Design a protein with these regions (language model features):
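Non-catalytic, solvent-exposed segments at the cell envelope interface
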Residues: 1-215
């Protein structure tokens, strides 16, 4: 399993591209996070690419728009098209995951332990803490995991948040790779949650199964 940034290059063994969109319903249903998975079954490798939601895209009307706002404007299809034009690829499948879906998927994968690098807190619109994490190594439940990948501070801003999202994903994937392939298949086949997707449960389960055997 690999992580990459930048544009994908053409190759004889073309991968299958999956776009995962994280929806922030509290911000008017904008795309809060984007992850592209390039699955190359022939090469037995998967590459994950984080796409900053604040990336500017130019449309045919010659107007600039932030990538995250394409979802609010035209839904998943609009965002999918924008990413295709940005990276010059054809996306085969996509899934939109909201906060509830994220919590459910992480809960089924099991507690994820990691080192929280700083104290993190955030108040919601009602003045209540919706993120509250102490510094240190600790197991995160699904709600805490959501807070970790959502958190943005003044020091490192959006870049820091993307780095945390990538770090969490690496640890999650390592956790899944430590389990039996059949267990991952069953977990995803009967438990994968998405508010909108054209990835079938069987396709998602197949990805999880093969992921277990990839370096």
């Amino acid at each position: 399993v690999h992580f990459a940034t930048g544009r994908m290059h053409a190759d004889e063994a073309k991968p299958t591209y999956y776009l995962f969109i994280g929806e922030d319903e509290t911000a008017g249903s904008e795309a809060d996070a984007m992850l592209l998975l390039a699955d190359n079954d022939k090469k037995k490798e998967m590459t994950f690419i984080s796409i900053p939601p604040n990336t500017k895209v130019v449309r045919q009307e010659k107007t600039n728009l932030l990538l995250k706002d394409t979802f609010k404007e035209g839904g998943a299809e609009e965002t999918k098209s924008a990413v295709e034009n940005l990276l010059h690829i054809r996306i085969d499948k996509y899934a939109v995951v909201n906060y509830a879906d994220f919590r459910e998927n992480v809960s089924k994968a099991g507690p994820i332990s990691l080192y929280v690098e700083k104290y993190m807190e955030h108040l919601d619109r009602d003045g209540s803490f919706d993120i509250g994490l102490n510094q240190g190594y600790q197991p995160l439940d699904s709600e805490q995991a959501l807070g970790y990948v959502r958190y943005v501070d003044k020091e490192d801003g959006e870049i820091g948040r993307i780095q945390r999202q990538e770090r969490f994903l690496k640890i999650l994937l390592s956790h899944l790779q430590s389990r039996m392939a059949l267990r991952n298949w069953l977990t995803v086949r009967y438990g994968f949650c998405a508010v909108e997707s054209d990835i079938t449960p069987s396709e998602a389960a197949s990805l999880a199964y093969r992921l277990t055997g990839y370096p």
